[in-house]
Amino acid sequence: MSLLELDGVKVHFPVKKGLLFDRTVGHVYAVDGVSLSVEAGQTYGLVGESGCGKTTLGRAVLRLNDITEGAVVFDGTDLAKLPSEEMRAFRRRLQMVFQDPLGSLNPRQNIESILAEGMAAHGIGKDAAERRKKIESILAKVGLPSNAMSRYPHEFSGGQRQRIGIARALVLEPDVIICDEPVSALDVSVQAQVINLLEELQESLGLTYLVIAHDLAVVRHISDVIGVMYLGGLVEEAPSDALYAGPRHPYTKALMSAVPVPDPEVEDRRERILLHGDLPSPANPPTGCRFHTRCPWVQETKCATERPPLLDTGDGHKVACHFTAEIEAGTVKQTLATGIEAVTGTETVAAEAVETAEGEAGTEAPVKEPATVPAQADADATEKAAAVPAQADAEAKEKAAAATEKVADATERTEGGPKA
């Protein structure tokens, strides 16, 4: 049995209107029917573009957001139905590392106070001295010195603050840690350090991770299984290597085509899938398949009317698409432009293709006149070159004559003036 299992989880936020008497006029369907399972000791990566509901789903697992419908089963217990007092005990075993390390740390508390607060709330450690000793041990595991306990969050770098956030989760000895964009706010060099730290802690402590991210390279490096979310739903799930080797959902294909390839020759040859339009509003999602408004392979049947279930297509690879097999076999053709056509338009690209084909078909090149044109050009150039100095000499002589006349006039005036 899985350590953490989600079954049809929905998180809908009501949209209210009115000054005195609030009335619900609609809902934001942030998470709309997500089912997944995470095995003990496994890392499950959840990816998708901004606004697809990844963070909301992670917070719903911890009951930081109320669950509208569905079940969150942790170690055999449905957390969605637990009273608040009973849920308190499970929160120690489920911890979260937040996206913004500075915003999640109290600026008025030093590090020892921040880490000891959770321990005291859950009764970990007999007294302050024992808790202090455990905090020193945890800080050493995340690569921070013991003198960090007396310092405040603003005195640390971004990477160090994220390590403090990880330490805060570890002091409670959790079974599952939900990492919400753990490295998105950090430099690339620091990202590698934090990812390696998470892997080392998983090996030494037997932790289970649910990693939420939009960086596909980070998710591939750390995850065993990857789920792809789009507009509140899971559209594809597969083992990490299988997903990157052969994505099957049109949305996943578009995501993977956006990942740059270091080899320039491969980068130039591979297909680039550009999607039309923006992510639809979760307050008014499309009917049928959520992705059909942007899908390059959209069909007139089913796509706009029936929402596809997430089905296993073999080897643990699950896809939510009506035409997965047909797209893979090539029997369903693209109905929307995807490459440069999506930017310049299909008519422009078609016209350029016709011109190229006509050029390659081989109209005879015009015969050039033999050497007469260059000879004429040389003669013209020589004539112009000779004319320029002659014209310059004439202008110089005119200016000299004018200057001589002015001097003569001035002399006559001087000689003809009154004598002393």
What are these regions (language model features)?
Residues 20-24, 79-95, 121, 128-129, ...:
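ABC ATPase NBD coupling module
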